[in-house]
Amino acid sequence: MQLPKVVLLLCAAALLLSGAVRGCGPGRVVGRRRRPTKLSPLSYKQFSPNVPEKTLGASGRYEGKISRNSERFKELTPNYNPDIIFKDEEITGADRLMTQRCKDRLNSLAISVMNQWPGVKLRVTEGWDEDGHHFEESLHYEGRAVDITTSDRDRNKYGMLARLAVEAGFDWVYYESKAHIHCSVKSEHSAAAKTGGCFPGEALATLESGEKIPVSQLSPGLRVLAMDNSGRPTYSDFLSFLDHSPKEEHMFQVIKTQDPHRRLFLTPAHLIFVSDNYSTPASEFQAVFASSVRPGQYILVSNVVGLIPAKVRSVNTQTNYGAYAPLTQHGTLVVDDVVVSCFALVQKQRLAQIVYWPLRVLYNLGIIAGTQPSQQMGIHWYSKALYHLGRLILHGNEFHPLGIVQLES
């Protein structure tokens, strides 16, 4: 992170602070119109995000072919957007059928194409496939994928078309062929489409009294076990929830350790402190995405003597209900006896702690009240605003793809 980026984010945070003092919400920032972000085209055979299509970090697993006679056919909706040209080789209208998520992304992309190249429209060459023309388990069979070009079929535009598709919110974009761009989305009910940076509601936090309570029951005024900048255990004020979604199903990483045994559920985009060596001081453990933790690495856990390294035995995924992301004064927290960050989405713990400083000031001064669980649903407005500001300053690759899905859907 270069210093100017930090300064810009701090300035953005200061703007949010002044807006919050005036109206308890992000509002509209008045000032000069921002310069458009410079976009870089995708290269031939490049895909984004840089993971396989049918994985958690992209469009998710194949869920089965949809036919006109199947129950799931009702999940498909026709797209009659006049700004999109559908090739419709089959003359059945099949290419117009797609899931709502795919339709929303495609309509957004159509606007971007017209803005990028006046007089040019988006063209769909393949949408839902009912005839079996694609490879086995293709997302075309579920209406979750489209192959696209520009209406003028200028192949020099296709790299930028792919980039525009990424920006439009497609969950996976592939410069698959010199003749088209392939785009796909998550299923409508996929838990993978609902992953911010959180813990399940039954995960336990440790109070200053020694009592352990579910994170869902945290409230302002409580002090919870955390880690300070020196890597020592401390008790930190709970301020608010950065995410509070008690009823939604989410996908969690399940990290298990040995010597001592611990088990932690957290979403893939959340930060956790990791080292490759047992002898690394606690203060030098690095904050990384939970999705990048591997067996054999070490994470920090709490026991009677303090915070110690524990070797990761296994990492897998599991769905669970409820998602809570507590914010503390120190930006860290001990959940289920494992040290974790309060932050997610960007793999920069120190930067996150800095840009959340204005929000902590608001709570400490009593200008805004701490969040009671019943008062907030979903992602905190400050987190959403910081995310959108960060997208103007940081490179897209610095964001976890699943966090982007959560904040842009």
Curated annotation (Swiss-Prot):
SUPFAM superfamilies: Hedgehog/DD-peptidase, Hedgehog/intein (Hint) domain. CDD domains: Hint. Ca(2+) 1 binds at E89, E90, D95, T125, E126. Gene3D superfamilies: 3.30.1380.10, Hedgehog/Intein (Hint) domain. A lipid is attached at C24 (N-palmitoyl cysteine). The record marks H270 as: Essential for auto-cleavage. InterPro entries: Hedgehog, Hedgehog_Hint, Hedgehog_sig/DD-Pept_Zn-bd_sf, Hedgehog_Signaling, Hedgehog_signalling_dom, Hint_dom_C, Hint_dom_N, Hint_dom_sf. Ca(2+) 2 binds at E90, E126, D129, D131. Interacts with BOC and CDON. Interacts with PTCH1. Interacts with glypican GPC3. Signal involved in the early induction and patterning of anterodorsal ectoderm, nervous system and somites. Induces ectopic cement gland formation in embryos. It is involved in the regulation of endochondral skeleton formation, and the development of retinal pigment epithelium (RPE), photoreceptors and periocular tissues. This is Indian hedgehog protein. The lineage of its organism: Eukaryota, Metazoa, Chordata, Craniata, Vertebrata. The gene is ihh.
